[in-house]
Amino acid sequence: MMRDSPSIQGTLDAATQHALLAGRHADPFSVLGPHQAGAHTVVRVLAPGARTVMAVLPGGQRTPLLPMQPGLFENTVPGLQPGAPAAYRLCIEWEGGIQHTADPYAFGPVLDAAQLDHCAAGGWRYLAGLLGAHAASVDGCAGTRFALWAPNARRVAVVGDFNGWDGRRHAMRLRYPAGVWELFLPDVGPGARYKFQVLGADGHTVLKADPLARQAEAPPATASIVPDERPFAWTDEAWMEQRAARQRCDAPISIYEVHAGSWFDDAGAPRWQSLAARLPEYARSLGFTHIELLPVMAHPFGGSWGYQPLGLFAPAAAHGAPADFAHFVDRCHEAGLGVILDWVPAHFPDDAHGLARLDGTPLYEHADPREGRHPDWNTLIYNYGRREVRAFLIASAIHWLRHYHVDGLRVDAVASMLYRDYSRPAGQWIPNRHGGRENLEAIDFLRELNAAVGVQCPGAITVAEESTAWPGVTAPVANGGLGFDYKWNMGWMHDTLRYMRRDPIHRRHHHHDLSFGMVYAYAERFVLPLSHDEVVHGKGSLLGKMPGERAAQLAQLRLYYAFMWAHPGKKLLFMGGEFGQQGEWNHDAMLQWSLLDDPAHRGLQRLIADLNHVYATLPELHCRDADPSGFAWIVGDDADNSVLAFARVDASHCLVAVCNFTPVPRPGYRFGVPHAGDWRVRVDTGATRYGGAGGGPPICLRSEPIPAHGHPQSLVLDLPGFTALYLRHSE
């Protein structure tokens, strides 16, 4: 064992020595590592807690570095030529053993200057590859390159398992003017936990998780993890080649919305592995085309369902490793399912280890709470006017779409981004530069985001959760729109659910709640969403919204689903809705799968499968979703009977949906049809296979030359109560 070395005065002044040992020195490369001293090379090493330090040359020559103070070592190293990082290694004796490593302060700058300039100018293209923790080999030495954007920080160090979380040991180099701090640490590899210790502009020292970490600890732990960067072995080439066609506005899109943590409890099995084995096949068997996941990004509070994320580049560790998530996506693609992620660029939580005041200033957020704090969620709002923040968010979006082969992003809370006065009373918001309420910077960001996705991720889609009548959400950016592919139709959802909650005897007075959606159905490219938001916070389940006894509730839910699947717009249904979950969704418990022991609930599930099949295989139900010529009212004004009938058409086919929203049968109900001939029943929600009582119309009906509702031909049938029928014209 080496003996403690005698101390020396050293060549550093006392103030510099004190700053290094106190963790306050802002430019460690100016004093640590190899430095020319006349004709000789001096090596200085800061290793608090070390007993001895040796500099070892490639030929084996060993030079002891002598302590100026405990933990700060220096000596002239004979034969050492400066400028060659591999010219020596360090042999450090700690209380627990010997460490052999290259000297981090022997390496020059490791980040590409041109790429840094690009990022500093607001470019996102290189951001995910520059910042964060990345495996690197520098001058033949393997390790990890760390980088953090913190332009106003006085000092930044990387701390972790590899240095005992001692912020003095690995202070970073500032790359001015980009405001990025960097350090290459030899011998640090995948799995190492780390954080950044930041001495902020406000004089406070804080520990921050890596904003661009690609792996993170599971809460309540908050450290980032150096990722394993071995590429995943994807098998989805065929899917990726055809996904653009599967996601166009003329394609059938039926989305199964899932919270990964509560879909199924597989006795403690890793979540993504368990889901990969079950969920894709289940969704495929029911005819869904996509799975949409509530946010999977790392988030500190499970009760937020992921909508308050802090790790915009890392899958939540509670569900498994990043490779497990990639495997899940790959399995979905193997099953013919697209994967959409909910993504949250609207706000972020103010947890101490997160983005809030990251460098001692409001860096990612606004300084003024009238712009920077969200009144609904008590979270912080991104400063979209800052080019580096926009680049950070766009880099996150592209990361999920490219690195994980995700097929789309559903952008959360877009309305809160578009309006400066969103949920704010008078006097509590700041107008834009023109004196208006529109958030011009957020508008520019959304347009830039959608343009980037379109160029960088061909075939991927973006979907806006936008709850107002903002014009042009799905219009092209070139035409002044925001550039989304689809928008959630929140108005349709609110109107129709409000209607369904009413006692059927009163529905005649609210007929417009069902029909009004067609007034604006083609203003945007819409998704009809029955999402998680409708089964939480005391709203009850979808089944529970239906009035009456259990049999009536199930009949009305079947009717409502058939109305929705026939209505123009892509479909979205939250998990549990497919079999009539009775209780409100609880993110801490799995779905009520035991309900499928009941034939009535199995029948509802079977109806969803049949609706998806009919929707996907009959082109008139999807190919003109964005074209007004694909829809025509037949009976839109029969409020007294609470009956609706409408046609869905394409160039060669016609399907008529007839819906009775009361329990009262309508015998001899006549309605016009566009074509003479036979009309076959494709769906009858009252059929026994769906849990109904049966007794519906015959499988085939022939039109009569009796004019009705503006058509020379008509059908007449006995229309059961709480029933929807799909009738397709036979060529």
Curated annotation (Swiss-Prot):
Catalyzed chemical reaction(s): Transfers a segment of a (1->4)-alpha-D-glucan chain to a primary hydroxy group in a similar glucan chain
Keywords: Carbohydrate metabolism, Glycogen biosynthesis, Glycogen metabolism, Glycosyltransferase, Transferase
Entry-linked CDD domains: AmyAc_Glg_BE (cd11322), E_set_GBE_prok_N (cd02855)
Active site: 412 (nucleophile), 465 (proton donor)
GO biological process: glycogen biosynthetic process
Domain of life: Bacteria
A GO molecular-function descriptor: hydrolase activity, hydrolyzing O-glycosyl compounds
Pathway(s) annotated for this protein in UniProt: Glycan biosynthesis; glycogen biosynthesis
SUPFAM superfamilies: (Trans)glycosidases, E set domains, Glycosyl hydrolase domain
Annotated Gene Ontology cellular component terms: cytosol
E.C. no: 2.4.1.18
Pfam families xref list: Alpha-amylase, Alpha-amylase_C, CBM_48, GlgB_N
SMART domains: Aamy (SM00642)
Function: Catalyzes the formation of the alpha-1,6-glucosidic linkages in glycogen by scission of a 1,4-alpha-linked oligosaccharide from growing alpha-1,4-glucan chains and the subsequent attachment of the oligosaccharide to the alpha-1,6 position.
Alphabetized HAMAP family for the sequence: GlgB
Subunit-structure text: Monomer.
Family: Belongs to the glycosyl hydrolase 13 family. GlgB subfamily.
NCBIfam families on file: branching_enzym, PRK05402.1, PRK12313.1
Record-given protein name: 1,4-alpha-glucan branching enzyme GlgB
Organism expressing this protein natively: Bordetella bronchiseptica (strain ATCC BAA-588 / NCTC 13252 / RB50) (Alcaligenes bronchisepticus)
